Amino acid sequence: MKKIIQAVAASSLLLLAACGSNEGSESEGKEKLVVSTWGFNEDFFRKEIYKPFEEENNVEIVLDTGNNADRLNKIKQGNSDVDVIFLSDYYAQQGIQDGLFDTIDRENIPNVDKIYDVAKAPLGEEYGPAYTIAQFGIAYNPDESPIKITSWKDLWSADMKGKITIPSITSTTGPMMVDIASMVKGEETFNEDAAFTSLKEIMPSVVKEYGQTSEYVNMFAQGEIAAGPIMEMYFADLKEAVPNAEFVTPAEGGYAVMNTMNVVKGTDQKDLSEKFINYILGKEAQEKSAKNKVDSPVNVDVQLSDEEAEGLTYGEDLINSLHTMDMKFVNDNLKGWIDRWNRELIQ
């Protein structure tokens, strides 16, 4: 009897070892796709977005997370094995100008035909599309603001003195503030001198510039400010702090902030990378992200109810009304703008 038990135990151990070996072989046999992205909502993306792609393509997605600047710098330094990188258009343009991205074959990304025109080639036909668009507009507290905010020009009103914040020039939306300042002066095309004259005029109204959204939220919640430009995707945080807060698409139009996907130069997974980009643009992935309030959809086939669309940059009319900036022009001129900002505006 003892021998029988020993034999059964030995067989069990062999079976477990075999199972473990098979599991290891399965994992080792899978292709890996390294995706560089932000760390927010990681659980959602792993379960709802990445897992279906992994199962369908027998691939393992490995994430490299961090902010735009750090992740781009890692690739620039050459110590990265990233295949696909998600970046805001502002940082993606830097990567393009530094020669860090491969060109894409749009025949491998047919879902590009299903997205809004503005998202198809925000940085040129040779590079990746945008998979989401955030609106840069104005949030304000009607209980604290002496005027109703409907326009960019309202931020320059004398009534708003000591009541607003604006993004710092080095933040993602800082360059947009320069463009807005030119527009407020009545310029039909960008005029740098007019912009900085306009910015000088608004500075007495600025309590503090913000570099991080959390700074804006804190000032807003504590009643230090009554209004300021912000991306709509962060408005939920303001609404939680101040339930009466309102988000406004200015009469002159908001600005589009786009997050893009690009294939990193040197990858040996170019085809798989393009397949992944196509998948992210598909209706199913776009709809999941939108309905979970994670990203605003660019796929035109995604249909949302008013409740589902609340807080998202959604709908053809709104998307088409947004201003876009030439990111190459921004990057070529940003150093000069930063110098002028620090020299002329910072006291």
Short names for language-model regions:
Residues 15-18:
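C-terminal motif of bacterial Sec signal peptides marking the signal peptidase cleavage site
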Residues 20-22:
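Bacterial signal peptide processing site
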Residues 28-94:
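Early extracytoplasmic/lumenal segment of secretory-pathway proteins
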Residues 40-46, 81-221:
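Extracytoplasmic ligand-binding site segments that recognize negatively charged/polar headgroups
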Residues 92-94, 221-222, 227-244:
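A ligand-binding cleft/hinge motif common to bilobed small-molecule-binding domains
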Residues 134, 197-202, 242-265:
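Periplasmic-binding protein-like
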Residues 259, 264-322:
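Mature extracytoplasmic/periplasmic domains
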Residues 320-347:
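Conserved C-terminal helix/tail region of periplasmic/extracytoplasmic solute-binding proteins
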